[in-house]
Design a protein with these regions (language model features):
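Catalytic machinery of carbohydrate-active enzymes
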Residues: 1-356
């Protein structure tokens, strides 16, 4: 063990020392829910916001969101106040100082692995009680069981992050009514999506094809994208394929569309925000995606879905799609989407088309 890790391990042990405090709630408790992760993380954990507000209508629910998912939090009617997490301590500390003054009854920590910075953050905010999901990964070679700085944890035998998050409600003595994800967006975003889709024949099945996730390892190769487009049309020519893309990517996305597909495959309109993306996904008939954020968003709207995952079964157990109709296609590799079965993607998509 190098000296740097030795210092980190001992520091983590020191800040993890903790006496369990009682959970005491009034009829109008004040909650801080940490959701400063990715878009998909917030969607998967979204049911707890609804269920807490249902059980405690006068609760004051504050959410700490990230820059990438803050719009989802701001549009959620169960959230009373949103605080945006900052990566730099000099920007984060004034926010934490303000949160400390609010004297939260309960903070809820939803990371699936141990993160030292979050432990320090909650030490500074100092809520009366901290509830946390059980951790799948430890830190610096220590197991999650060696690092337990919070008051109460969810059942460690649960695997999927949705179920682990919902177990927070058990700690609060709340019987939840349903497990569905929530994604909210304004009517304007819906009208923009419908206006774009009105350009196409209403009799067509409109498929949303997303080709990349949050990093290059979650990207479908250009050649495979072309094969998927041509393969889908070969098996059913009553379709329109919309290539979902990030703002500014329209030009290179357009170049992926084969010339022979120019009458049925098109780039999407610019989705400048998460709410634009949510609106178009909600308006499409079927989704194909390797991006777990889009996968979980499609699940929130219960859209027929073909999800493409790396062959990493631990992460799949935690983050697999949950909806009425979905198929999962695995890459042959744990760390990339190289060597995915295009025929299987096309065939599973065709099966879902028959349900529409």
């Amino acid at each position: 063990m190098n000296f740097s890790n030795y210092i980190k391990i001992n520091f983590l042990k020191i800040i993890s020392r903790h006496k369990v405090r009682p959970l005491i709630l009034s009829s109008s408790p004040k909650f801080l829910i940490l959701m400063n992760q990715k878009i998909g993380d917030m969607i998967v954990c979204s049911p707890i916001l609804r269920e807490i507000k249902s059980a405690y209508p006068h609760a004051d629910i504050h959410v700490m969101a990230s820059e990438v998912n803050k719009e989802l939090a701001l549009s959620n009617p169960y959230v009373d106040k949103v605080h945006v997490y900052k990566n730099q301590w000099q920007k984060l500390l004034p926010i934490l100082s303000g949160l400390r003054k609010l004297n939260f009854d309960v903070a809820v920590e939803l990371e699936y692995k141990v993160i030292s910075r979050i432990i320090i953050l909650l030490k500074i905010v100092n809520p009366n009680c901290i509830l946390s999901v059980s951790k799948s990964e430890g830190r610096y070679g220590m197991s999650p069981q060696e690092i337990m700085p919070y008051d109460y944890y969810t059942n460690s035998s649960l695997f999927h992050q949705r179920d682990t998050c919902l177990d927070i409600l058990r700690l609060l003595n709340i019987d939840y009514k349903n497990k569905f994800y929530d994604v909210f967006y304004p009517e304007k975003n819906k009208l923009d999506a419908l206006s774009f889709l009105s350009l196409f024949e209403s009799s067509k099945i409109i498929i949303g094809l997303n080709i990349e996730g949050s990093n290059d390892e979650k990207k479908i190769s250009n050649e495979d994208v072309k094969k998927i487009i041509l393969g889908l049309h070969a098996i059913n020519n009553n379709i329109i394929i919309i290539l979902l893309h990030k703002p500014g990517d329209k030009d290179w996305i357009s170049k992926l569309i084969p010339n022979e597909a120019s009458l049925y495959a098109f780039p999407s309109y610019p989705t400048e925000s998460i709410l634009d993306l949510a609106a178009i996904i909600d308006s499409l008939d079927l989704i194909i995606s390797p991006d777990t954020s889009i996968v979980h968003m499609a699940c929130a709207f219960n859209k027929p879905l073909v999800a493409i995952y790396r062959n990493h079964m631990l992460l799949f157990e935690i983050w697999h799609p949950i909806s009425d109709f979905n198929y999962v296609i695995f890459s042959d590799h744990e760390d990339s989407l190289k060597s995915i079965d295009i025929d299987n993607i096309v065939n599973q998509t065709f099966k879902l088309m028959k349900r529409i």
